[in-house]
Amino acid sequence: METQAVKTIRDELRELENTVAQASDMVLSEQDHRNASAIREMTQSVIAMSKENSLISVSNEIDYNEEIGNLAIDPSLIDEKIKQSNNFVELLKLTHLEQEALDYFLRYTISSTNTLELESTSDPKFVSLENEVTELENKTLTEHRDKIQEAKKDISDKSKDLANKQDQINELCLGAANSVDECWKMLNELEDIHSQRDNDVKETLSQDTTTTSDLIEETYKEWSSLQTSLTELNNSKDELDQLIAFKNEKHKDNDSTKIRNANIKNKTITENVKMLKLLINFWESNFIVPGSKKSKLSNLEVYPQTKKFQFKCAEQYTVIIQLNQNGGSIKSIEIFENDGKSVQENKNLSSLILNKYKNPLSSYPIFQVINDIVEELK
């Protein structure tokens, strides 16, 4: 079952995936529109030139009013066609100059009142004027050709730059899509890890379980045995006190060392009695009257082989206590919380309880620690 964090990540990934898809579609649409616009402009230019210049023609089968998308023009052939047209124009110009240069010059350049006496085309004056015309013509053509070459180079550079930027944008979109795919893979792996952890927790909680009725019966027997042991312990304490008092009176001077040892033993017995009383109060308040309002615990389960026991507290908490090897003190505490969807370890609660103890857990009575846990979780 997915957690809130996984659900949030999943929603963010979906949103990011939609954003990348929209950006990619927009980029591709802009590129298609730009290419279509360029082809449309070239097509319109060719059509316009074909109408204004008889040297350029378009197939008669093409309807000028039809959609541009149906008019097929290969831009790669334009340079070759332009070169062919330029060669053809040059031939026409040479022919025209050879046949009409003299007539054109005489009619529009030389005044009728100041005629030149030219005997032939080899006349020095004619040759000089012809050279001047050719020089001016070549200069003008060179300037125009330079401008055309410069414009062509500028167009080529901008086209290459635009193509490079388009490639970079496409690579960025592809990289973003690949990153989103990787995020989806990692999210699936995270869900598998969460699922495996939940299964491990459930398996741990279900090992070595005993029935509730057997547990209550066993607990009651242990409680009865503890009551008997406590009575015997109190009797032994009274006898020990009498014996110590007797020895103090009879061997006051000679047995001081033995008395100190007896006092130490008496102190240990007193601590044991106190712990047994805590145990009796704990069992009486939590297990002897199952289901009563005083009961704060339920589902007590004991695992003798692993030296673990667990119980439920406040309905949604399950507490697992690991005892030391000798079974007389606590080694560690784990608290699991059921939020209605899954069972997960609540490390914050565990840390909060452990921080209350300045010394190691093994130095505190077991049932004192359990009571503290119950009070914290109730």
Swiss-Prot record:
Tell me a GO biological process for this protein: homologous chromosome orientation in meiotic metaphase I
Q: Which residues form a coiled coil?
A: 1-32, 130-172, 224-277
Q: Which keywords does this chain's UniProt record carry?
A: Centromere, Chromosome, Coiled coil, Kinetochore, Nucleus
- Transmembrane stretches in the record are none
A GO-annotated cellular component: nucleus
For whether the record's keyword set contains Transmembrane, the answer is: no
Q: What is its main location?
A: nucleus
What Pfam families does this protein map onto? Kre28
Give the UniProt subcellular location, in the record's own words.
Answer: Nucleus; Chromosome, Centromere, Kinetochore
Q: Which family does it belong to?
A: Belongs to the KRE28 family.
Q: How would you summarize the oligomeric state and partners of this protein?
A: Component of the KNL1/SPC105 complex composed of SPC105 and KRE28. Part of the ten-subunit outer kinetochore KMN network that includes the KNL1, MIS12 and NDC80 complexes.
Its biological purpose: Acts as a component of the outer kinetochore KNL1 complex that facilitates microtubule-kinetochore interactions and the spindle assembly checkpoint. Kinetochores, consisting of a centromere-associated inner segment and a microtubule-contacting outer segment, play a crucial role in chromosome segregation by mediating the physical connection between centromeric DNA and spindle microtubules.
Q: What is this protein called?
A: Outer kinetochore KNL1 complex subunit KRE28
What is the originating organism of this protein?
Answer: Vanderwaltozyma polyspora (strain ATCC 22028 / DSM 70294 / BCRC 21397 / CBS 2163 / NBRC 10782 / NRRL Y-8283 / UCD 57-17) (Kluyveromyces polysporus)
Q: What is the lineage of its organism?
A: Eukaryota, Fungi, Dikarya, Ascomycota, Saccharomycotina
